[in-house]
């Protein structure tokens, strides 16, 4: 069974621990082992929530995978992504990609119409969550898989390569994709997730 958890700007508190706790509760509602899949900032969430005993593996899709004491923001500073100048906070501290720059920053390998839809429906994260540090990364003791987007302008590809290497991922797949690889390269992304689930089910 596949379950999807979306964290929107209107449904979370300022504390990223709420995201982790909500994910853990969803894990506890499943009847069996769980493979967590995280995209972008969702990778940081599954890195912490993945310590739940029912989680048997993690799959990162162009995602943050912080180490102990590390934050997504700290990783970003190692290799600043091309789209960084196009992010701007609003008066409540949420980080938005400028609408006019969204397509070229987030999903340049999709059509302009698809980019427009994503721009007007984007879920802005609280800027402060990028400074939240991981206490213990689940990938340190659980099998993991990683998909790198080689044309990513949101999380620098060099940061993705670094994270996938240090976690000693079972498999790393590099796709010629933007940050929106789930939409632009769905077959490749789905194949990696399917492979992970199949291996864990043996």
Locate the predicted segments by residue.
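Short, amphipathic alpha-helical "lid/cap" segments that border enzyme active or binding sites
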Residues: 20-24, 186-194
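Gly/Ala-rich beta-loop-alpha elbow adjacent to hydrolase catalytic centers
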Residues: 37-42, 46
